[in-house]
Amino acid sequence: MLDIQLLRKDAALVAERLAARGFAFDAARFDALEAERKTIQTRTQDAQSRRNTLSKQIGMLKGKGEDTTAVMAEVGGLGDELKQLETRLSELQAELNDFLMGIPNLPHESVAPGKDETANVEVSRWGTPRQFDFAVRDHVDLGEGLGQLDFAAAVKITGSRFSVMRGGLARLHRALAQFMLDLHTTEHGYTEVYVPYVVNAESMRGTGQLPKFEEDLFHVPRSDADRLYLIPTAEVPVTNLVRDEIVAAEALPLKFVAHTPCFRSEAGSYGRDTRGMIRQHQFDKVELVQMVRPEDSYAALEGLAAHAETVLQRLGLPYRKMALCSGDMGFSAAKTYDLEVWLPAQNTYREISSCSNFEAFQARRMQARFREGQGKPELLHTLNGSGLAVGRTLVAILENYQNADGSITVPEALRPWMGGVERLTPA
Protein backbone atom coordinates (compact mmCIF):
# COMPACT_ATOMS: atom_id res chain seq x y z
CA MET A 1 0.00 0.00 0.00
CA LEU A 2 1.24 3.47 -0.84
CA ASP A 3 1.66 6.13 1.82
CA ILE A 4 -1.51 8.24 1.67
CA GLN A 5 0.51 11.27 2.75
CA LEU A 6 2.47 10.98 -0.49
CA LEU A 7 -0.78 11.10 -2.45
CA ARG A 8 -2.01 14.08 -0.45
CA LYS A 9 1.27 15.90 -1.01
CA ASP A 10 1.75 15.27 -4.75
CA ALA A 11 -0.91 13.14 -6.40
CA ALA A 12 0.20 14.31 -9.86
CA LEU A 13 3.71 12.91 -9.37
CA VAL A 14 2.31 9.61 -8.08
CA ALA A 15 0.00 9.41 -11.10
CA GLU A 16 2.95 10.01 -13.43
CA ARG A 17 5.03 7.24 -11.85
CA LEU A 18 2.09 4.84 -11.85
CA ALA A 19 1.46 5.58 -15.53
CA ALA A 20 4.97 4.24 -16.21
CA ARG A 21 3.72 0.82 -15.18
CA GLY A 22 0.48 1.11 -17.15
CA PHE A 23 -1.76 1.99 -14.23
CA ALA A 24 -4.28 4.81 -14.57
CA PHE A 25 -4.58 6.57 -11.22
CA ASP A 26 -8.15 7.79 -10.64
CA ALA A 27 -7.30 11.27 -9.38
CA ALA A 28 -10.92 12.43 -9.52
CA ARG A 29 -12.04 9.59 -7.27
CA PHE A 30 -9.23 10.24 -4.79
CA ASP A 31 -9.90 13.99 -4.74
CA ALA A 32 -13.62 13.42 -4.15
CA LEU A 33 -12.99 11.03 -1.26
CA GLU A 34 -10.40 13.35 0.27
CA ALA A 35 -12.62 16.41 -0.06
CA GLU A 36 -15.54 14.69 1.66
CA ARG A 37 -13.24 13.26 4.34
CA LYS A 38 -11.86 16.72 5.13
CA THR A 39 -15.36 18.21 5.28
CA ILE A 40 -16.73 15.47 7.53
CA GLN A 41 -13.63 15.54 9.71
CA THR A 42 -13.92 19.32 10.17
CA ARG A 43 -17.64 19.06 10.96
CA THR A 44 -16.90 16.26 13.43
CA GLN A 45 -14.22 18.28 15.19
CA ASP A 46 -16.48 21.35 15.30
CA ALA A 47 -19.36 19.31 16.75
CA GLN A 48 -17.06 17.75 19.35
CA SER A 49 -15.73 21.17 20.32
CA ARG A 50 -19.26 22.60 20.56
CA ARG A 51 -20.39 19.65 22.69
CA ASN A 52 -17.45 20.12 25.05
CA THR A 53 -18.23 23.83 25.38
CA LEU A 54 -21.89 23.11 26.11
CA SER A 55 -21.00 20.43 28.64
CA LYS A 56 -18.93 22.97 30.56
CA GLN A 57 -21.79 25.45 30.28
CA ILE A 58 -24.20 22.90 31.78
CA GLY A 59 -21.87 22.49 34.74
CA MET A 60 -21.74 26.24 35.28
CA LEU A 61 -25.54 26.60 35.01
CA LYS A 62 -26.09 23.80 37.48
CA GLY A 63 -23.64 25.44 39.85
CA LYS A 64 -25.75 28.60 39.72
CA GLY A 65 -28.98 26.65 40.06
CA GLU A 66 -30.17 27.79 36.63
CA ASP A 67 -32.23 25.88 34.04
CA THR A 68 -30.17 23.60 31.75
CA THR A 69 -33.00 22.15 29.66
CA ALA A 70 -32.28 24.06 26.44
CA VAL A 71 -28.54 23.47 26.60
CA MET A 72 -28.98 19.76 27.33
CA ALA A 73 -31.35 19.47 24.37
CA GLU A 74 -28.69 20.99 22.12
CA VAL A 75 -26.08 18.58 23.51
CA GLY A 76 -28.42 15.69 22.76
CA GLY A 77 -28.84 16.89 19.19
CA LEU A 78 -25.09 17.20 18.81
CA GLY A 79 -24.72 13.63 20.04
CA ASP A 80 -26.98 12.35 17.28
CA GLU A 81 -25.16 14.47 14.71
CA LEU A 82 -21.77 13.25 15.92
CA LYS A 83 -22.87 9.64 15.67
CA GLN A 84 -23.86 10.17 12.04
CA LEU A 85 -20.67 12.08 11.24
CA GLU A 86 -18.43 9.48 12.87
CA THR A 87 -20.22 6.69 11.02
CA ARG A 88 -19.70 8.47 7.70
CA LEU A 89 -16.07 9.23 8.56
CA SER A 90 -15.45 5.53 9.25
CA GLU A 91 -17.09 4.67 5.92
CA LEU A 92 -14.88 7.17 4.10
CA GLN A 93 -11.75 5.81 5.77
CA ALA A 94 -12.75 2.31 4.64
CA GLU A 95 -13.40 3.57 1.09
CA LEU A 96 -10.01 5.29 1.02
CA ASN A 97 -8.35 2.13 2.31
CA ASP A 98 -10.04 0.05 -0.41
CA PHE A 99 -8.98 2.64 -2.98
CA LEU A 100 -5.36 2.45 -1.81
CA MET A 101 -5.47 -1.36 -1.80
CA GLY A 102 -6.06 -1.31 -5.54
CA ILE A 103 -3.02 0.85 -6.36
CA PRO A 104 0.26 -0.91 -7.25
CA ASN A 105 3.65 0.05 -5.89
CA LEU A 106 5.69 2.85 -7.42
CA PRO A 107 8.61 1.68 -9.57
CA HIS A 108 12.06 2.51 -8.24
CA GLU A 109 13.90 5.25 -10.12
CA SER A 110 16.36 2.68 -11.53
CA VAL A 111 13.59 0.67 -13.22
CA ALA A 112 13.49 1.05 -17.00
CA PRO A 113 10.20 2.31 -18.47
CA GLY A 114 8.27 -0.09 -20.68
CA LYS A 115 4.95 -1.78 -21.29
CA ASP A 116 5.87 -5.46 -21.27
CA GLU A 117 8.66 -8.04 -21.23
CA THR A 118 10.07 -6.76 -24.53
CA ALA A 119 11.41 -3.73 -22.62
CA ASN A 120 13.15 -5.77 -19.92
CA VAL A 121 16.88 -5.19 -19.62
CA GLU A 122 19.43 -8.01 -19.65
CA VAL A 123 21.88 -7.50 -16.79
CA SER A 124 24.15 -10.52 -17.17
CA ARG A 125 24.52 -14.09 -18.41
CA TRP A 126 26.18 -17.10 -16.85
CA GLY A 127 27.19 -20.34 -18.51
CA THR A 128 27.21 -21.46 -22.12
CA PRO A 129 24.30 -23.45 -23.53
CA ARG A 130 25.34 -27.00 -24.33
CA GLN A 131 25.73 -28.02 -27.98
CA PHE A 132 24.08 -31.40 -28.57
CA ASP A 133 25.16 -33.91 -31.24
CA PHE A 134 21.74 -35.57 -31.20
CA ALA A 135 18.12 -34.45 -31.51
CA VAL A 136 17.13 -32.62 -28.33
CA ARG A 137 14.01 -33.89 -26.57
CA ASP A 138 11.83 -31.85 -24.24
CA HIS A 139 11.26 -32.68 -20.58
CA VAL A 140 7.92 -34.34 -21.25
CA ASP A 141 9.38 -36.85 -23.71
CA LEU A 142 12.36 -37.42 -21.44
CA GLY A 143 10.32 -37.93 -18.26
CA GLU A 144 7.79 -40.19 -19.95
CA GLY A 145 10.64 -42.07 -21.66
CA LEU A 146 12.09 -42.77 -18.23
CA GLY A 147 8.70 -44.11 -17.19
CA GLN A 148 8.83 -41.71 -14.24
CA LEU A 149 6.67 -38.75 -15.31
CA ASP A 150 2.96 -39.42 -15.71
CA PHE A 151 0.56 -36.68 -16.77
CA ALA A 152 -2.24 -39.10 -17.67
CA ALA A 153 -2.40 -40.34 -14.08
CA ALA A 154 -2.57 -36.75 -12.83
CA VAL A 155 -5.44 -35.98 -15.21
CA LYS A 156 -7.30 -39.05 -13.93
CA ILE A 157 -6.72 -38.08 -10.29
CA THR A 158 -7.34 -34.35 -10.55
CA GLY A 159 -7.29 -32.77 -14.01
CA SER A 160 -4.96 -30.89 -16.33
CA ARG A 161 -1.87 -28.95 -15.20
CA PHE A 162 -0.86 -31.47 -12.54
CA SER A 163 1.82 -34.17 -12.63
CA VAL A 164 2.77 -37.49 -11.05
CA MET A 165 6.44 -38.42 -10.61
CA ARG A 166 7.84 -41.79 -9.66
CA GLY A 167 11.10 -43.45 -8.74
CA GLY A 168 14.33 -41.66 -9.47
CA LEU A 169 12.62 -38.59 -10.88
CA ALA A 170 10.55 -38.10 -7.71
CA ARG A 171 13.73 -38.53 -5.71
CA LEU A 172 15.55 -35.98 -7.88
CA HIS A 173 12.70 -33.53 -7.32
CA ARG A 174 13.03 -34.03 -3.54
CA ALA A 175 16.83 -33.80 -3.72
CA LEU A 176 16.58 -30.43 -5.44
CA ALA A 177 14.50 -28.96 -2.61
CA GLN A 178 16.83 -30.39 0.03
CA PHE A 179 19.90 -29.10 -1.80
CA MET A 180 18.41 -25.60 -2.04
CA LEU A 181 17.36 -25.52 1.61
CA ASP A 182 20.74 -26.72 2.84
CA LEU A 183 22.59 -24.22 0.63
CA HIS A 184 20.54 -21.25 1.81
CA THR A 185 20.63 -22.19 5.50
CA THR A 186 24.30 -23.19 5.75
CA GLU A 187 25.91 -20.70 3.35
CA HIS A 188 23.53 -17.78 2.94
CA GLY A 189 22.36 -17.28 6.52
CA TYR A 190 18.65 -18.04 6.18
CA THR A 191 16.53 -19.63 8.90
CA GLU A 192 14.32 -22.45 7.65
CA VAL A 193 10.65 -22.15 8.56
CA TYR A 194 7.71 -24.50 8.15
CA VAL A 195 4.48 -22.61 7.54
CA PRO A 196 0.79 -23.32 6.83
CA TYR A 197 -0.18 -23.99 3.23
CA VAL A 198 -3.61 -22.45 3.89
CA VAL A 199 -3.93 -18.79 4.91
CA ASN A 200 -6.65 -16.28 5.72
CA ALA A 201 -7.69 -13.27 3.64
CA GLU A 202 -5.80 -10.84 5.87
CA SER A 203 -2.54 -12.62 5.06
CA MET A 204 -3.31 -12.42 1.34
CA ARG A 205 -4.06 -8.71 1.65
CA GLY A 206 -0.84 -8.15 3.54
CA THR A 207 1.38 -9.32 0.69
CA GLY A 208 -0.77 -7.85 -2.08
CA GLN A 209 -2.52 -10.91 -3.55
CA LEU A 210 -5.88 -9.52 -2.45
CA PRO A 211 -8.02 -7.84 -3.48
CA LYS A 212 -6.66 -7.60 -7.04
CA PHE A 213 -5.79 -11.25 -7.77
CA GLU A 214 -8.70 -13.15 -6.26
CA GLU A 215 -9.33 -15.10 -9.48
CA ASP A 216 -5.78 -16.46 -9.49
CA LEU A 217 -6.24 -18.11 -6.08
CA PHE A 218 -7.69 -21.41 -4.92
CA HIS A 219 -9.90 -21.00 -1.87
CA VAL A 220 -11.35 -23.38 0.68
CA PRO A 221 -15.19 -23.20 0.54
CA ARG A 222 -16.33 -21.48 3.72
CA SER A 223 -18.32 -18.34 4.43
CA ASP A 224 -17.06 -15.24 2.60
CA ALA A 225 -16.28 -13.65 5.96
CA ASP A 226 -14.05 -16.57 6.93
CA ARG A 227 -12.59 -17.64 3.58
CA LEU A 228 -9.24 -19.46 3.53
CA TYR A 229 -6.86 -19.72 0.58
CA LEU A 230 -4.26 -22.21 -0.65
CA ILE A 231 -0.96 -20.35 -0.82
CA PRO A 232 0.24 -19.26 -4.30
CA THR A 233 3.74 -18.87 -2.86
CA ALA A 234 5.44 -19.22 0.53
CA GLU A 235 5.95 -15.46 0.37
CA VAL A 236 2.46 -15.09 1.83
CA PRO A 237 2.75 -17.03 5.11
CA VAL A 238 6.44 -16.27 5.63
CA THR A 239 6.17 -12.49 5.15
CA ASN A 240 3.10 -12.43 7.39
CA LEU A 241 5.21 -13.73 10.26
CA VAL A 242 5.96 -10.06 10.98
CA ARG A 243 2.42 -8.75 10.49
CA ASP A 244 1.39 -6.48 13.39
CA GLU A 245 4.83 -6.96 14.94
CA ILE A 246 7.53 -4.52 16.03
CA VAL A 247 10.94 -6.10 15.48
CA ALA A 248 13.96 -4.98 17.48
CA ALA A 249 16.37 -3.24 15.10
CA GLU A 250 19.28 -5.34 16.33
CA ALA A 251 17.48 -8.48 15.10
CA LEU A 252 17.58 -7.25 11.49
CA PRO A 253 17.92 -8.45 8.86
CA LEU A 254 15.45 -11.30 9.21
CA LYS A 255 16.13 -13.96 6.56
CA PHE A 256 13.76 -16.90 6.14
CA VAL A 257 13.61 -19.80 3.70
CA ALA A 258 10.70 -22.20 3.23
CA HIS A 259 9.94 -25.13 0.94
CA THR A 260 6.24 -25.42 0.17
CA PRO A 261 3.85 -26.52 -2.52
CA CYS A 262 2.24 -23.57 -4.31
CA PHE A 263 -1.24 -23.46 -5.82
CA ARG A 264 -2.33 -21.16 -8.65
CA SER A 265 -5.41 -21.18 -10.85
CA GLU A 266 -3.46 -19.64 -13.77
CA ALA A 267 -6.69 -17.88 -14.72
CA GLY A 268 -4.94 -15.48 -17.08
CA SER A 269 -2.77 -18.03 -18.88
CA TYR A 270 -5.30 -20.04 -20.89
CA GLY A 271 -3.55 -21.77 -23.77
CA ARG A 272 -0.02 -20.96 -22.53
CA ASP A 273 2.45 -23.74 -21.67
CA THR A 274 -0.27 -26.39 -21.73
CA ARG A 275 2.31 -29.14 -22.24
CA GLY A 276 4.47 -30.30 -19.37
CA MET A 277 5.54 -28.87 -16.03
CA ILE A 278 6.28 -25.24 -16.86
CA ARG A 279 2.91 -23.84 -15.78
CA GLN A 280 0.99 -26.00 -13.30
CA HIS A 281 -1.75 -25.54 -10.73
CA GLN A 282 0.47 -27.19 -8.09
CA PHE A 283 4.25 -26.91 -7.92
CA ASP A 284 6.98 -26.81 -5.29
CA LYS A 285 9.15 -23.81 -4.61
CA VAL A 286 11.90 -22.84 -2.20
CA GLU A 287 11.23 -19.24 -1.23
CA LEU A 288 13.65 -16.67 0.20
CA VAL A 289 12.19 -13.82 2.29
CA GLN A 290 13.99 -10.93 3.96
CA MET A 291 12.88 -8.09 6.25
CA VAL A 292 15.42 -5.26 6.49
CA ARG A 293 16.00 -1.62 7.37
CA PRO A 294 14.85 0.71 4.56
CA GLU A 295 18.38 1.92 3.82
CA ASP A 296 19.57 -1.66 3.36
CA SER A 297 16.87 -2.98 1.04
CA TYR A 298 18.50 -2.44 -2.35
CA ALA A 299 21.78 -4.01 -1.25
CA ALA A 300 19.65 -6.86 0.13
CA LEU A 301 17.96 -7.27 -3.27
CA GLU A 302 21.33 -7.73 -4.96
CA GLY A 303 22.31 -10.27 -2.31
CA LEU A 304 19.04 -12.18 -2.52
CA ALA A 305 19.30 -12.45 -6.31
CA ALA A 306 22.88 -13.66 -5.94
CA HIS A 307 21.70 -16.39 -3.55
CA ALA A 308 19.24 -17.64 -6.16
CA GLU A 309 21.93 -17.42 -8.85
CA THR A 310 24.22 -19.59 -6.74
CA VAL A 311 21.74 -22.46 -7.01
CA LEU A 312 21.84 -22.30 -10.81
CA GLN A 313 25.62 -22.01 -10.84
CA ARG A 314 26.12 -25.00 -8.53
CA LEU A 315 23.81 -27.02 -10.79
CA GLY A 316 25.68 -25.88 -13.90
CA LEU A 317 22.56 -24.46 -15.55
CA PRO A 318 23.07 -21.56 -17.99
CA TYR A 319 20.90 -18.55 -17.21
CA ARG A 320 20.49 -14.84 -17.68
CA LYS A 321 19.52 -12.11 -15.21
CA MET A 322 16.87 -9.63 -16.34
CA ALA A 323 15.85 -6.33 -14.75
CA LEU A 324 12.12 -6.02 -15.34
CA CYS A 325 10.72 -2.85 -16.86
CA SER A 326 8.01 -0.85 -15.13
CA GLY A 327 5.15 -2.48 -17.03
CA ASP A 328 6.24 -6.08 -16.42
CA MET A 329 6.70 -5.97 -12.64
CA GLY A 330 4.35 -7.57 -10.15
CA PHE A 331 1.72 -5.47 -8.37
CA SER A 332 3.62 -5.05 -5.08
CA ALA A 333 7.19 -4.74 -6.40
CA ALA A 334 9.31 -1.59 -6.59
CA LYS A 335 12.11 -3.41 -8.44
CA THR A 336 12.43 -6.96 -9.73
CA TYR A 337 15.10 -9.19 -11.20
CA ASP A 338 14.06 -12.32 -13.06
CA LEU A 339 16.46 -15.22 -13.48
CA GLU A 340 15.78 -17.14 -16.69
CA VAL A 341 17.23 -20.61 -17.20
CA TRP A 342 18.19 -22.02 -20.61
CA LEU A 343 15.82 -24.71 -21.92
CA PRO A 344 17.37 -26.46 -24.95
CA ALA A 345 14.10 -27.92 -26.25
CA GLN A 346 12.57 -24.44 -26.42
CA ASN A 347 15.84 -22.86 -27.54
CA THR A 348 15.22 -19.98 -25.17
CA TYR A 349 15.51 -18.74 -21.60
CA ARG A 350 12.50 -19.18 -19.27
CA GLU A 351 11.83 -17.61 -15.88
CA ILE A 352 12.89 -19.75 -12.93
CA SER A 353 13.15 -17.10 -10.21
CA SER A 354 11.74 -13.66 -9.54
CA CYS A 355 13.49 -11.55 -6.88
CA SER A 356 11.80 -8.35 -5.72
CA ASN A 357 12.14 -5.46 -3.32
CA PHE A 358 8.73 -4.25 -2.14
CA GLU A 359 10.15 -1.42 -0.03
CA ALA A 360 7.46 -0.53 2.58
CA PHE A 361 4.49 -1.49 0.35
CA GLN A 362 3.73 -4.82 2.05
CA ALA A 363 4.86 -3.65 5.49
CA ARG A 364 2.38 -0.76 5.41
CA ARG A 365 -0.45 -3.19 4.68
CA MET A 366 0.70 -5.51 7.45
CA GLN A 367 1.87 -2.87 9.93
CA ALA A 368 5.20 -4.69 10.06
CA ARG A 369 7.63 -2.41 11.83
CA PHE A 370 10.96 -2.21 13.63
CA ARG A 371 12.19 -0.04 16.46
CA GLU A 372 15.64 1.40 17.08
CA GLY A 373 16.17 1.54 20.85
CA GLN A 374 13.38 3.61 22.42
CA GLY A 375 12.64 5.38 19.15
CA LYS A 376 9.45 5.53 17.14
CA PRO A 377 8.52 2.36 15.21
CA GLU A 378 9.31 2.50 11.48
CA LEU A 379 8.05 0.37 8.61
CA LEU A 380 10.27 -2.49 7.51
CA HIS A 381 11.24 -3.11 3.91
CA THR A 382 10.39 -6.62 2.66
CA LEU A 383 11.92 -8.68 -0.13
CA ASN A 384 11.47 -12.14 -1.54
CA GLY A 385 12.57 -14.38 -4.36
CA SER A 386 12.43 -17.95 -5.57
CA GLY A 387 15.47 -19.89 -4.60
CA LEU A 388 14.31 -21.73 -6.82
CA ALA A 389 11.09 -23.04 -8.35
CA VAL A 390 11.71 -26.77 -7.90
CA GLY A 391 9.64 -28.08 -10.81
CA ARG A 392 11.15 -25.70 -13.35
CA THR A 393 14.63 -26.52 -12.06
CA LEU A 394 13.84 -30.19 -12.62
CA VAL A 395 12.71 -29.36 -16.16
CA ALA A 396 16.00 -27.54 -16.78
CA ILE A 397 18.04 -30.48 -15.48
CA LEU A 398 16.15 -32.99 -17.62
CA GLU A 399 16.72 -30.96 -20.76
CA ASN A 400 20.28 -29.74 -20.12
CA TYR A 401 21.59 -33.06 -18.76
CA GLN A 402 19.90 -35.41 -21.23
CA ASN A 403 21.84 -38.09 -23.07
CA ALA A 404 21.31 -39.64 -26.50
CA ASP A 405 19.94 -42.85 -24.97
CA GLY A 406 17.25 -40.97 -23.03
CA SER A 407 19.04 -41.20 -19.69
CA ILE A 408 19.67 -38.15 -17.49
CA THR A 409 23.00 -37.37 -15.87
CA VAL A 410 22.52 -36.25 -12.26
CA PRO A 411 24.42 -32.98 -11.61
CA GLU A 412 27.35 -33.55 -9.28
CA ALA A 413 26.00 -31.03 -6.76
CA LEU A 414 22.88 -33.18 -6.24
CA ARG A 415 24.52 -36.58 -5.87
CA PRO A 416 24.95 -36.37 -2.07
CA TRP A 417 21.14 -36.02 -1.85
CA MET A 418 20.66 -38.85 -4.36
CA GLY A 419 22.60 -41.50 -2.48
CA GLY A 420 25.40 -41.23 -5.01
CA VAL A 421 23.19 -42.01 -8.02
CA GLU A 422 24.87 -40.58 -11.13
CA ARG A 423 22.28 -41.26 -13.82
CA LEU A 424 18.54 -41.76 -14.23
CA THR A 425 17.78 -44.51 -16.72
CA PRO A 426 14.53 -45.82 -18.20
CA ALA A 427 12.72 -48.18 -15.85
From Swiss-Prot:
It comes from the Bacteria. One of its GO terms (molecular function) is serine-tRNA ligase activity. Pfam families: Seryl_tRNA_N, tRNA-synt_2b. It catalyses: tRNA(Ser) + L-serine + ATP = L-seryl-tRNA(Ser) + AMP + diphosphate + H(+); tRNA(Sec) + L-serine + ATP = L-seryl-tRNA(Sec) + AMP + diphosphate + H(+). Keywords: Aminoacyl-tRNA synthetase, ATP-binding, Cytoplasm, Ligase, Nucleotide-binding, Protein biosynthesis. Pathway: Aminoacyl-tRNA biosynthesis; selenocysteinyl-tRNA(Sec) biosynthesis; L-seryl-tRNA(Sec) from L-serine and tRNA(Sec): step 1/1. ATP binds at residues 264-266, 351-354. Consists of two distinct domains, a catalytic core and a N-terminal extension that is involved in tRNA binding. NCBIfam families: serS. Catalyzes the attachment of serine to tRNA(Ser). Is also able to aminoacylate tRNA(Sec) with serine, to form the misacylated tRNA L-seryl-tRNA(Sec), which will be further converted into selenocysteinyl-tRNA(Sec). This is Serine--tRNA ligase.
